[in-house]
Amino acid sequence: EDIVKIIRSVPPGNESSMTTNGTLLGSLAHDLRKAGLARVNISLDSLNPENYKSITGTGLLSDVLEGIQAARDAGLTPIKINMVLLKGINEGEIDDFIHLVSGDRHLILQIIELMDLGGCPLHADLSELEEKIALHSRKVITRRMHHRKKYCYEGAEIEFVRPWHNSDFCNHCTRMRVTSDGKLKPCLLRDDNLVDIRGKRGEELQRLFLAAAKKREPYNK
């Protein structure tokens, strides 16, 4: 309920972006843009309404598609569509997602590999798919920070996110995450260096943020 207020409170000169499921963007996109939000990433793992509901457990696919349009209209671009490939669930929807972003310069498709923690049955290796896309791409751009490739394929811009296979992704990470139970998480792949910030304010909260930042180090060192 207070997301617009939070965005508005970000000091000038700092770019704000947001990853969202997109279900409320239809009504909030323009207010978020006015508040200073620059762009959005939208998590969307299926374009099939029944499949979408099965994956998310709630919400309507139509709300997300409306949110994508609203974000485009509000200028929250480029919009990255984050699709996590799930084995046996949405593997057959790749062409549908490519069609969704094809020909739209404001949309980028990010196909994300699910982390294979302990032999997850939903994990799907992206190697073969990326090789296929690379082979038939009109143009390939290598991003400087993570050395991640962007493929211009059938009118679509496509990126593959595979942190397990890209040490540069880890070495150049600038993220600090907050867990659902109020802990700072310096590294996506670790749970042994969390910093509890529940109930903390002011200088104490600032001190804990700095302490968490000092715990940051490449996971693959």
Where in this protein do the model-derived segments appear?
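Radical SAM/AdoMet-radical enzyme domain recognition
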Residues: 1-111
